[in-house]
Regions:
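Outer-membrane beta-barrel translocator/channel fold
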Residues: 2, 25, 90-102, 106-168
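Short loop/turn motifs that connect adjacent beta-strands in outer-membrane beta-barrel proteins
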Residues: 42-49, 76-77, 112-115, 181-192
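Flexible, solvent-exposed coil segments and beta strand-coil junctions
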Residues: 44-50, 81-88, 142-158, 217-225
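Residues that define the transmembrane beta-barrel architecture of outer-membrane proteins
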Residues: 48, 62-66, 99-103, 168-172
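Transmembrane beta-barrel strands of outer-membrane/channel proteins
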Residues: 54-58, 84-86, 120-124, 192-206
C-alpha cells in the first residue's frame, strides 16, 4: 500500500489480489477502506480478568489519534468488548484534514461443553477527508526552485480548496457454530462444525465541492454534491 501524505487518508494499492472473491456487489472506493473495519477485522475475546488497552499518538501538524478498548468476561462462557477509535489530523497542505471515527462492540458465547459458539458484533464508523487535488504546477515549481516564500507546504496553492468526501458504514453481524466433534480444545484444527451467519451492512459515500473549479473540466464546472 502507498499512503497519501496525511494520516487517515487514502491508500493506493501497488498490486492486485487475484484470490479475493466477492459474492455480492461492493460499493467500491477501495482506497478509502484501508482504515475501515471489515467483518474479519473485529476481534472476539476470552479473558480471565478485565482487560483494557489504550493507544494514543499525535498526528500531522494538529490533531490526535486515540483508540480505547475494554473487554471482560461476565462468566467463563460469555465475554463482551467495547472499543472506540477517534482520529483528527490537519495535514501538511491546504484542505487536507482527516477526521475518522469508529465504534465497535463484540461478544463471544460458548456453551459449557463448547459444542455451541455464538459470536457477533456491531460497528459504526465514518471516514471523512478534505480533498485538495494536489499542488498546482506553479506552486510546485516555486517550491522546487527554493523560493523562500514557498518553503512551507502549508502556503502552497492547491487545485481544490473546498472539496470534501466521507464514507460512512454500519454493520451488524452474528454467527452461530455447532461443533459435531473436536470440541475438547478450542484450538483444535481437526474439528467439524456447521454454522449460520447473518450480516447486515449499509454504506454511504458522498463527495462535495461547494466552490466552482475547472480542474475536472466543464463537466464539473458548477457546485458538486454526489
Amino acid at each position: 500500500l502507498l499512503p497519501f501524505v496525511n494520516m487517515g487518508h487514502a491508500f493506493n494499492k501497488l498490486g492486485y489480489n487475484f484470490f479475493e472473491e466477492n459474492l455480492i456487489p461492493q460499493i467500491g472506493k477501495k482506497s478509502k477502506h484501508a482504515s475501515y473495519f471489515k467483518t474479519e477485522d473485529i476481534k472476539y475475546y476470552n479473558v480471565p480478568t478485565p482487560f483494557t488497552e489504550l493507544f494514543f499518538r499525535t498526528t500531522m501538524e494538529q490533531g490526535q489519534l486515540s483508540d480505547a478498548l475494554i473487554t471482560l468476561n461476565l462468566n467463563p462462557n460469555f465475554n463482551f468488548a467495547i472499543a472506540y477509535r477517534g482520529m483528527r489530523s490537519q495535514g501538511k497542505y491546504v484542505n487536507q484534514r482527516s477526521n475518522n471515527e469508529a465504534f465497535r462492540y463484540s461478544f463471544n458465547f460458548n456453551s459449557k461443553d463448547y459444542k455451541y459458539n455464538f459470536i457477533g458484533h456491531y460497528v459504526s464508523q465514518n471516514i471523512g477527508n478534505n480533498e485538495n487535488g494536489g499542488v498546482t504546477e506553479q506552486s510546485l515549481l516555486q517550491f522546487e526552485l527554493g523560493d523562500p516564500e514557498f518553503k512551507e507546504r502549508s502556503v502552497l496553492n492547491v487545485r481544490l480548496k473546498r472539496a470534501y468526501n466521507e464514507l460512512k458504514g454500519k454493520r451488524s453481524f452474528f454467527r452461530q457454530n455447532f461443533f459435531l466433534r473436536g470440541t475438547e480444545n478450542l484450538k483444535n484444527e481437526n474439528s467439524m462444525s456447521i454454522f449460520h451467519e447473518f450480516l447486515n451492512e449499509t454504506k454511504f459515500y458522498i463527495y462535495e465541492d461547494i466552490q466552482r473549479s475547472e480542474y475536472f473540466g466543464p463537466v464539473a464546472s458548477e457546485e458538486v454534491k454526489d
